[in-house]
């Protein structure tokens, strides 16, 4: 049993390695095909731009220019026609004569000018430096930490009014004690002033005795 157990995992190992090699070969072959030359659309645009004919380049003249550049025209005849149609639909080429792939073609100046303008836009692609400015924003967050210091200072201010309130409360009973003895001596003084006023009616009694003397004079 111990001899058969290690033999089982050893068998699937070569089966796993084989598809990896096939994928590597396929990717290498695809890379070689792509690196063989530029696409047909680029060759067509270069050939049309190089021609000096005002009426445009005919399909026959275009094939001659591509053959002179080393492009196999006979094998890629269908690709040339498809490339012409796609360039006309995009607006890079203008068909001056004929319909479809047959006829004469001319480079669209507006499209060429539009292709030249995107180059400065690439320079504007360097604008992602603004994220560095976004990194500066966290510095403002450090400034937001300053209110925390102010929040720590506020409790100190709250303690001061509490101490002042305690001092005022301590002072207020002193005023109350000083006010009570002042009112007490005033009350007996008023009472003394009232007693002599009550003695005045006693002086009025002798005035009533004057009429008694009048009948004595008649005698």
Curated annotation (Swiss-Prot):
Its main location: nucleus. H1 histones are progressively phosphorylated during the cell cycle, becoming maximally phosphorylated during late G2 phase and M phase, and being dephosphorylated sharply thereafter. The modification N6-succinyllysine is found at residue 34. Residues 1-15 have a biased composition (Low complexity). Pfam families: Linker_histone (PF00538). The modification Phosphothreonine is found at residues 18, 146. It comes from the Eukaryota. InterPro entries: H1/H5, Histone_H1/H5_H15, WH-like_DNA-bd_sf, WH_DNA-bd_sf. Residues 36-109 form the H15 domain. The modification N6-(beta-hydroxybutyryl)lysine is found at residues 34, 52, 64, 85, 90, 106. GO terms for biological process: nucleosome assembly. It is found in: Nucleus; Chromosome. The modification N-acetylserine is found at residue 2. The modification Citrulline is found at residue 54. Residues 20-35, 119-140, 149-160, 168-185, 192-219 have a biased composition (Basic residues). Transmembrane segments: none annotated. GO terms for cellular component: nucleosome; nucleus. PROSITE patterns: H15. Keywords: Acetylation, Chromosome, Citrullination, DNA-binding, Hydroxylation, Methylation, Nucleus, Phosphoprotein. Residues 1-41, 91-219 are annotated as: Disordered. The modification N6-methyllysine is found at residue 26. Belongs to the histone H1/H5 family. The C-terminal domain is required for high-affinity binding to chromatin. Histone H1 protein binds to linker DNA between nucleosomes forming the macromolecular structure known as the chromatin fiber. Histones H1 are necessary for the condensation of nucleosome chains into higher-order structured fibers. Also acts as a regulator of individual gene transcription through chromatin remodeling, nucleosome spacing and DNA methylation. This is Histone H1.4. The lineage of its organism: Eukaryota, Metazoa, Chordata, Craniata, Vertebrata. The gene is H1-4.
